[in-house]
Amino acid sequence: MSQSNSHGQSNLAKFAFNIYGTLSTNSSTPQSHEISPSSSLSSSRSKKQTSQYNTQDTNNNRLSYYCDKEIISLSQLNCSLSIGGYSGDLQHHVVIGGKNYLRLLCVSESQQRIISGINLLESKSIYNSRAPNKLINVNTIKTFADTIATGLSNGVVSIYKISPNGQSKVTGKYSDHNRTINSLDFIESENQLLSGSQDGTIKLWDLRSSSTKPVMTVQANLHSDPIRACQYSPHSAVRNKICVLSVHDSGALCKFDLRTKSGGKVYSPEKKWNLHTGPALSLHIHPEKELVVTGGRDKRISIFNYGERQSRNTPQNLINTYGPVVKVRWSTYTNTEETAEEFEENKQAKPNTLYNYDIACSYLNDDPTITIYNLGRKFIPKQIIHSKKPIQNFIWARNETRSRKIWTISKSSTFSSYNLDRLEDSDVSRPIEDLNNIAMTWDNNNDFCAVSQARYDYDLETYENGINETTEENFDAERNYSLGNEELIHSQANSLTASPVDKPQLTRSLTFNPASSFSTFSPVLVARAATGFLQNDSATSSSSIPNMQVSSSRPKLTRNTSQTTQDSSSSQFASVLPPPSASQTYSSPQYKKNNPPRFMNNPAYVIPVSIPIPANDEYVFRKLSSESLVSTPDGFTLVDVCLLNASVAASVGNNRTSQIWRLLAVSIQEEFESGIEPRRIYAFQPEAINKLPQDVQETSTNANDTLHAETTNSNFVESFKSTSTSGSQFGKQSDKDERKLQSKNSSGNLMDMINKANRTNSFSATSFKFKEQERKEDESQKAQSIKDENERASIHSKSAPISISSHPEDLDDENMGSNNSAALKFSPPSVGVSIPSTRIISSSLASSPKSVRGPSGVKSHISRSRPSPPVQTWLKQKNLEVSNGSAMASTSGLSLTLKRNKTNEEGDQLTKAWKFKSLLRKSLDYATLQGDIIFCSTAALLFYDIVPEIISQFECLEWLGIYIEVLQRKRLFVNAINVIKCATADIQEKLQKLYCQDLSLRFYCSNCQALLVNEKSKFSGKGEFGYWYCDECSKLQSQCVYCNEPCKGLAVTVGLKCGHHGHFGCLKEWFIEDQNTECPGGCGYQII
């Protein structure tokens, strides 16, 4: 029965391979000529193997494999295997482990497809297990030749042997650890194995022995300090010394010597260094030197020299990352195979081994990236791998082409391969390619520094081969490359009179002062090439400037605005530099003869600039950030908050900002608090004039036959209004109603101010038609029809339309057009303007100014003009609306004229330019251009939840993020926290993730600069434990400036400038009781 089952499985596998070979052209699946139909699978291979081949993804020639269970660990097996049916010799394979999962994937020579998969959990074993289906968790994997060692979560170490035909066998199981095994490593051969566990011990196993007990147990302390990683060092300078390094949860790096005589147990390391303030999670030893790289939860990567002759206790290099580092690894191969275009080198390895190898690291907290650094430029990642899912583990992969490949496994149970040498891979970014050569930043004192650095100016040390000579032909070629058609530059550079003035080299101890520079010729921008071509030797040129280094590997920095640099040492030799290179330095034979090879350090040009900008006043910024309201207190409205912010801005002299806040307050009151719907203005339709009723036109014409036709027809409403306001009780009552309406609603004041400012330009012959939408929709149908009929009756086809206002005072003011027309008799028809009745109008054509309420021409004009009954009915209706408080504010003819061109032919609705949303958007745009971060942030905090369509979430986060950074830089931490507290819920959640994280405080000794951990006295029980002393140098850290006693716990600092501090009680006695104003340390610092 078993034979028939195995025969059926074999036939199924043959059939599946035939399908994949004939139906698929994908390079990741086996082809028909690679696996024959008669190929067979081992019985240890999974029954689900054939179904998993379909999940292989080879987009962009990337190897990908999906696992059906959760995977945690990853390693590479480098041994020769012969898979049945495949003619090639497979050398590099993938080993993946996880929860009840352990599989060996055989990869092709090109590492672009998976040939076969072997389930190692079904391997033959010499150990008889009563629970074959027991759940295991493979936490770590280590390989050596044909041996695979796995560390399980239950503290068991399992050893697998792989035969050349792909068969696997369990050869050993060792269980002496009490907790999870975190790290494994072989010692020079497959017979000795190291295991580091969470129980704080490192055990050495002899795999040739039949005993299941460890040969040696190593422990860092008497108490258990969990071991995160351990590794054997093959670079020991002492013969036969077995050196092992380990990192612990305490952040310590320990060095052990396994040549012990203490009976196989070591309880203290040979050396110990505290490199991290939190748990150290990973380590990896350099492939060539006694250097180790460690990564920890403190977001730091430390490169430390653990050699015998070194005595320093601090890392040799530090890399600050953007997340907690869970794994860090040196690259397998050097960078000698990289292209010359990327590093501006001719495939020559750097002599410093630190720069030959890259460093890759992955992060905690579900970060989907892997960052690659190089110590040649450690502050900027060299490459970043972006994955769709969080990265679980990774390794540098060995391959036949010695290319830089990284294998990864993600939390989505997917194995992927990334080739860092392929430029077309979209998931691998190169941040250095996107950086600008010039950058600028501000400091705490409102000064800024500009940095100018070429892209490939690595911070490299000297080359061992010295400085190479350059022939005359190379100089000619370089001149042609850098100059091209610049004959003007070439001609001026070859004359002594036009040579540039020598400038001293920029150093970090001096401040660059552009005002003291000489006027020099600024050539056209070329690729940072020197322009000196003087071939004459001049002793005064180089000797006049002290400390001049003529052989700088980078051209001197000029003091003009051009980025082209000029070499001031042209009297010694002539050179033109191509784009800056880290591997070549051009010099003359004379210079090489007189100067030996020296260090080639290419620092960036840092230019500190101090400009007294009035807007950067410290007092103004502090007052505005502290007193401006960013939220609405209880009992206040938005209008009150805007007015208070306006007063704060006015108190520091920011008058424009103050006026903007007041304008926003008026617009808020008009739109949100007045309760009046906004007026809607529609474009005038000329054909509506021809459709007016004939009886309305005849009535209006007969009522005004005693005056000139044009004057009377255009101003008969104003004449009637003047009669009513001068002699009737109705006019007096309308004045009272108008004043009540104006006191109730302030929105009309804004319109009147606009009309007053533009009254002299409000006369126009353009026709307009008004359609007013009333606020109350429950009016009777009869009143509505009467109003519409009277509106149409007020328009004449042969004259300009009449601007009818709901304010009696405005109608009285518009009579000014009638007076002028009656006096001049030939003036053109006009449109009424809202002008206060107490004003005196002066016309440029009249002989003297005339009062609007003057009795002389007004009464005679009114006595000859009476409005028609339809007009009286319309006016009564409008005055009734005024008394009820439901009238609309009038709109001047100037506003309509300005908006006339903004309407389309369909008559779309227009929006007021002084609306709140429009004013807010314009104010924010202007403040953004001016760099007013306080106004932008304050407005975003106040109005983001009110008008989210005006202030986007991206803008709000950007403004508030910059504002918080500036506040923290200026040490205004209370204001920064207040900004976060006043933000809306969605914004506050994102800001807290960025700016409210836990602080990591590191204390260093002020004498020996060692990290204060004081582990020697921590468990001794002698005295009070703390960080006010140092175990390394046995010196006190801080003493009270008043009583000269140690400051244990809380200490008060006198001032940030002097730095003296002391006990709270001592300083209270000195300053408050004794009423002293100077620092008790004698530095002369005044606190008041």
From Swiss-Prot:
Mapped zinc finger ranges (RING-type): 1040-1083
Pfam family, one: zf-RING_16
Composition-biased stretches (Basic and acidic residues): 769-794
Residues passing through the membrane, by range: none
Species of provenance: Candida albicans (strain SC5314 / ATCC MYA-2876)
Protein name: Restriction of telomere capping protein 1
Compartments where found: Vacuole
Top-level taxon in the UniProt lineage: Eukaryota
GO MF entries: zinc ion binding
Swiss-Prot/TrEMBL keywords: Metal-binding, Repeat, Vacuole, WD repeat, Zinc, Zinc-finger
UniProt-listed SMART domains: WD40
Its biological purpose: May be involved in a process influencing telomere capping.
GO BP term, example: positive regulation of macroautophagy
Entry GO terms, CC: cytosol; GATOR2 complex; vacuolar membrane
Residues in WD repeats: 131-170, 176-215, 222-266, 275-314, 367-417, 432-473, 502-546, 631-671
Organism lineage string: Eukaryota, Fungi, Dikarya, Ascomycota, Saccharomycotina
